[in-house]
Amino acid sequence: MAIAYAMDDLDMYLPSNVARRIKILKEPDYSGEVITRDEEVALLKHAADSKAVWLKAAIMLGIDCALRRSEMIGLKYRNIDFAKHTAKLEDTKNPTNITTNRTIGLSARVIEEIKKLPRSLDGRVITATSGDAFFRYWETCRNAAGVSKRFHCTRATFCTRAAENDWQLLDIATQTGHKDVNVLRKHYSKLQGEYLANKIKNNG
């Protein structure tokens, strides 16, 4: 834009505006896939048998609390308030690459599952050695459960269920860490048709 302004409005001579040659890529469409209740049961069942003792808790953290994989791997016991059911997420990054800290709520079953885990030497709750290792265990679990969805779908599942339970948009954004509400609206747009039909019916 600055180059075009200089050429068009200020009559500055430049051989060409190279910026105009850059193709602007369209943002990929959000798939909106959510994990069904039956799929959740199957995933948690097989996660309980995984060599990764933390996998069941990780799936719950995604579905119940909307944590990103990186946030799970960075979560430490010292940042969890077991009495208040909250966790402080430190140095998390949103899509704008701005580093932030935020405090989120944890579900009762997440609290109970975390309490069952063996304490690690480095204080982390989800002790995956890397993102790749995390996804390898997830792939094994989802294949055994007969589920084809990505782990990121756990966050979409949280958003959809929260919307169905009449959470306010700002509350969901605070929990998920979304800075762009328009991105979050995409999750809302994928609500199940049966649920929306019932909402309309109740308006009558």
Predicted regions and their residues:
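Non-catalytic DNA-binding core/recognition domains of DNA-processing enzymes
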Residues: 1-7, 22, 106
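Short, basic (Lys/Arg/His-rich) helix/loop patches that form interaction surfaces
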Residues: 48-55, 119-125, 135-174, 181-182
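Basic, Lys/Arg- and aromatic-enriched nucleic-acid-binding interface segment
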Residues: 13-69, 73, 155
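N-terminal core-binding DNA-recognition domain of tyrosine site-specific recombinases/integrases
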Residues: 1-4, 11-15, 29, 50-53, ...
